[in-house]
Amino acid sequence: MDNVIGLEIIEVVEQAAIASARWMGKGEKDTADHVAVEAMRDRMNKIHMRGRIVIGEGERDDAPMLYIGEELGICTQPDAAQVCNPDELLEIDIAVDPCEGTNLVAYGQNGSMAVLAISEKGGLFAAPDFYMKKLAAPPAAKGKVDINKSATENLQILAQCLDRSIEELVVVVMKRERHNDLIKEIREAGARVALITDGDVSAALSCAFSGTNIHALMGIGAAPEGVISAAAMRALGGHFQGQLIYDPDIVKTGLIGESKESNLARLKEMGISDPDKVYTAEELACGETVLFAACGITPGTLMKGVRFFGGGARTQSLVISTQSKTARFVDTVHMFETPKRPKALQLH
């Protein structure tokens, strides 16, 4: 799968990022997201595959494109029998976030990117639109920190694993009221807190790379993004755990239902028998081969944002593979058209 589709998924996130970046700073987050969705969907439909969205823009009734269950790729089209050999058919599950951090794009802030993860059919956990408690940490701490431990305990373990003092650690937490106690505990333990308003996939990803000055992600964010983060962290060998949050009182507001009971019933309908289960990266992205790709929309910790010039743009992307055990940064120059040159000044 890596050799067949690796370059193409880079182009998918690049096209989404370029489309969204045109709306950077214009205050229209829905438009920035919509154009990214369109660009991502259009490019995926040109890939020789039968793909199925398992994490997308929402349920079919709520999302016109990239909805959960939508099929994409050349081999899903009416004339597929003429161009797709059943013996060589590439069937994959896809998790997407065409514009992670729509507010960041709308207000010209750092940290937004277009992301996706793919695996063979059944290789990605189809997370509901719930919240998820998350813990991400570098490869050195894999299996040593634990989401069931307190933040203080995990910081002590993390400091030991990274051979540094707690005071030298930086923990990313989303700036939400529900995290006030967590933020207080982290600070009292001696670590530093980097607050973000959106974009915890980028934060989780940064934990796995040395030199980013991000050592952990803690707190509660959206579950679908948790699966995408897990795909990247599995490929990078980093630590990731996630636990679904079904009690609305914990998050106060957001994507989950009106009552704890209705959410538990929904999870049961989805076949999730243990709602309190703590999932590892290997369980959330369980496929034999998992690929993750991202492209910066606005500048971030790992990637530069889209930079436009006359007749083109330059992007920086990242593709990670469990198959090749690589993380490749890709710098691409896109030529749109020949820029129009101004007419020579006529002097009389």
Curated annotation (Swiss-Prot):
Substrates-to-products reaction catalysed: beta-D-fructose 1,6-bisphosphate + H2O = beta-D-fructose 6-phosphate + phosphate; D-sedoheptulose 1,7-bisphosphate + H2O = D-sedoheptulose 7-phosphate + phosphate
Pathway: Carbohydrate biosynthesis; Calvin cycle
Keyword RNA-binding recorded: no
InterPro entries: FBPase_class-2/SBPase
Molecular-function GO term, any one: sedoheptulose-bisphosphatase activity
Organism domain of life: Bacteria
Annotated EC: 3.1.3.11, 3.1.3.37
One GO-annotated biological process of the protein: reductive pentose-phosphate cycle
Binding of Mn(2+) 1, residues: 33, 57
Hydrolase keyword on record: yes
Binding residues for Mn(2+) 2: 97, 100, 225
GO cellular component term, pick one: cytosol
Binding locations of substrate: 100-102, 131, 176-178, 198-200
Keywords: Calvin cycle, Carbohydrate metabolism, Hydrolase, Manganese, Metal-binding
SUPFAM superfamilies named in the record: Carbohydrate phosphatase (SSF56655)
NCBIfam families: glpX (TIGR00330)
Main function: Catalyzes the hydrolysis of fructose 1,6-bisphosphate (Fru 1,6-P2) and sedoheptulose 1,7-bisphosphate (Sed 1,7-P2) to fructose 6-phosphate and sedoheptulose 7-phosphate, respectively.
Assembly and binders: Homotetramer.
Family from the record: Belongs to the FBPase class 2 family.
Protein name: D-fructose 1,6-bisphosphatase class 2/sedoheptulose 1,7-bisphosphatase 2
